């Protein structure tokens, strides 16, 4: 019996029929992990690109808005800015959910006529994320510096304005946050206002029925357009 057991043991040790299956079982977790990590990294890169494009489109669109009068500088209205803000939500789509997962800050960088310094004339914000502008708040005097990262600041010319947009967004993992470091995506963009703009204020089209103002003390998620066309 002892000899029979040894014979069977030797036969088992020489048997190679299950090697491939064992190797597959051992290697599959590593291959699966690598595949999921690659998918997460690719999705993160795509979302990063999308947020960057949204920042550019917001700044570009906000620099173009206004009425079409040829007799005076173009006025801009709260409804114009609401359209720009809602347009970014539509462009981002449900996958991004821009205002539920992030925050947009639109600033009008101008030159103070009295001090000749750069200052933020007005800001409009939207989004649930608790984030304040990294470059200043409404009414802040910026001296001669302007807005933007150190040594890369943009400045406005006298009588003109620069629309500066910041987006701070929390990435929503496709698989798991453990595959990534920080989930925060930050993007900025700026465009000089295209036409001669009335820089005195942002107007209401109908003062008796004013449109919502997206002030930066509010933290509101994705916008909803009602059946009568009103914007919340």
Where are these regions (language model features)?
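Short, low-complexity, Pro/Ser/Thr/Gly-rich segments in the mature regions of secreted, periplasmic
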Residues: 213-232
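Intrinsically disordered, low-complexity regions enriched in Pro/Ser/Thr/Gly and acidic residues
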Residues: 89, 100-193, 200-211, 220-222
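Amphipathic, coiled-coil-like alpha-helical scaffolding segments used for oligomerization/assembly
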Residues: 95-98
